[in-house]
A protein has these predicted regions:
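Residue-level recognition of oxygen-bearing side chains
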Residues: 72, 103, 110, 149, ...
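Hydrophobic alpha-helix immediately C-terminal to the catalytic Tyr-X-X-X-Lys motif of short-chain
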Residues: 163, 167, 171, 201, ...
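A glycine/serine/threonine-rich, flexible loop-to-helix segment
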Residues: 142-143, 194-202
Length: 332
């Protein structure tokens, strides 16, 4: 378990997943530093509210810094002197990455290199990297297993996350930095970004506005409750990667392993909200994949990972949360 004396630095700590991981760390007594640049990819007001929520759980130190700003990043890490680094900061989003490929490469690849270099220089004991199910691309081999070696991402975002994984492996190989990569599958829950499907669909259905659907609605996603993801991250913090060929590096899927079609998701939301969705049908978008489906056998066996919240229950919880914060949503 994370002890009170263990120093943990979490990048992207003001974000959706990061703020939940921060709360989990504080509940376990970690000495926590949160690093975030509070950028405007979506309203910084959301991120500040996330930080306030974390502060209600426990005390932490906040470091406003950009992982692309090497001098500021060095200053932040030298101040924190972490034993463990959890790297969740990233430029997110499949569709925007196709429009801004250089920015995604700069942040998700260059920023990760900057952080790994600082971890090497400061002799950090463990590096946990938040990756994505998107690295699997449009594979027909299901469920998606960590054993799959031919990964063909179909978006710039996915390619940058896979590049991040490869950099993690390289640093583990060259410098014996114990590293764990966690591939997150379609995470949802309170504080979800406003542009993500469940948040966006809920807001539009509640308001009686058209819900844009890309494709025929048959695309399936392995929706995973955010606290289940946070529990998986905690298990990774506790775990020492088993060296393969002398390299202390491992990859784990964190998902629910129960993919649901888009049409089924909308039907669930309609029942929970009590309103019918007004659908606006569009052609499929570049970068989207037909299915995500996590094989979580390895995470269950090695990390003790056990997703606990089924989709119906998670959506009910999400809608309750949304209704409590809807006026802040409108203001943002």
């Amino acid at each position: 378990m994370t002890s009170k004396s263990q120093r943990v630095l979490l990048t992207g700590g003001a974000g959706f997943i990061g703020s939940h991981v921060a709360e989990a760390l504080l509940r376990r007594g970690a000495h926590l530093w949160l690093l975030d640049n509070l950028d405007d990819f979506y309203s910084p007001a959301w991120k500040k509210a996330n930080l306030e929520a974390v502060g209600r759980v426990g005390n932490y130190e906040f470091l406003q810094a950009d992982i692309c700003d090497k001098p500021r990043l060095r200053e932040a890490l030298e101040r924190a002197r972490p034993q463990v680094v959890i790297h969740l900061a990233a430029r997110a989003g499949v569709r925007p990455s196709i429009e801004q490929p250089s920015l995604y490469e700069q942040v998700n690849v260059g920023g990760t290199v900057n952080l790994l270099e600082m971890c090497r220089k400061l002799a950090v004991r463990k590096f946990v990297f938040g990756s994505s199910s998107s690295v699997y691309g449009a594979t027909s081999r299901v469920p998606f297993s960590e054993e799959q070696v031919e990964l063909r991402p179909v978006s710039v975002y996915a390619a940058t996350k896979l590049a991040g994984e490869m950099l993690c492996y390289t640093y583990a190989h060259l410098f014996a930095l114990p590293t764990i990569c966690l591939r997150f599958f379609t995470v949802y829950g309170p504080r979800q970004r406003p542009d993500l499907a469940i948040h966006k669909f809920t807001a539009l259905i509640e308001a009686g506005k058209p819900v844009p659907i890309f494709g025929d609605g048959s695309a399936g996603r392995d929706y995973t409750w955010v606290d289940d993801i946070a529990a998986g991250v905690m298990a990774a913090v506790d775990y020492e990667p088993r060296p393969v060929d002398g390299v202390p590096f491992e990859v784990f899927n964190l998902g629910n392993s129960r993919p649901v079609k888009l049409t089924e998701l909308l039907e669930l939301l309609e029942r929970i909200i009590g309103k019918k969705a007004v659908l606006e049908r569009n052609l499929p978008q570049p970068g989207d994949v037909p299915l995500t489906w996590a094989d979580i056998t390895k995470a269950c066996r090695v990390l003790g990972y056990r997703p606990a919240v089924p989709l119906q229950e998670g959506l009910e919880r999400f809608v309750r949360w949304y209704r409590m914060v809807r006026f802040r949503v409108a203001a943002a």
